């Protein structure tokens, strides 16, 4: 069974790019456009890893991360921050890795494979 990755980003072209790339690399994907939606998808889909943009409307990635780490079932889900704003990763205490947009696909894939296989 393929590992599942939740892609959280408010930019539809980024979501499409990442989900297509991850599916082509052998992973299942699900997605959300903001932190509020992401928390619902996270609870339903129980992905093996989350890629997280931090600056989004409605609910930020930072708030989503705080809510996720308070949930006993979800708090250990690995998170990779993908942000267009340098230094924003500091708002997330323990990401597996941080990537700035535009994304280095090879490095991202290597990090994912090292983290969840």
What annotation goes with each model-predicted range?
Residues 11-15, 105:
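Short acidic/polar segment at the start of the alpha1 helix of CheY-like receiver
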Residues 16-24:
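Charged docking surfaces used in two-component/phosphorelay signaling
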Residues 53:
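Active-site residues of response regulator receiver
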């Amino acid at each position: 069974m393929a590992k599942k990755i939740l892609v959280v980003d408010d930019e539809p072209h980024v979501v499409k790019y990442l989900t297509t790339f991850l599916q082509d690399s052998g992973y299942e994907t699900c997605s959300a456009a903001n932190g509020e939606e992401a928390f619902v998808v996270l609870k339903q889909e129980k992905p093996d890893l989350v890629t997280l943009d931090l600056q989004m409307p409605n609910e930020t990635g930072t708030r989503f991360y705080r809510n996720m780490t308070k949930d006993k079932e979800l708090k250990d889900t690995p998170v990779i921050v993908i942000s267009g704003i340098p230094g924003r990763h500091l708002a997330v205490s323990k990401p597996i890795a941080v990537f700035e947009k535009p994304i280095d696909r090879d490095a991202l894939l290597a990090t994912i494979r090292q983290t969840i296989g």
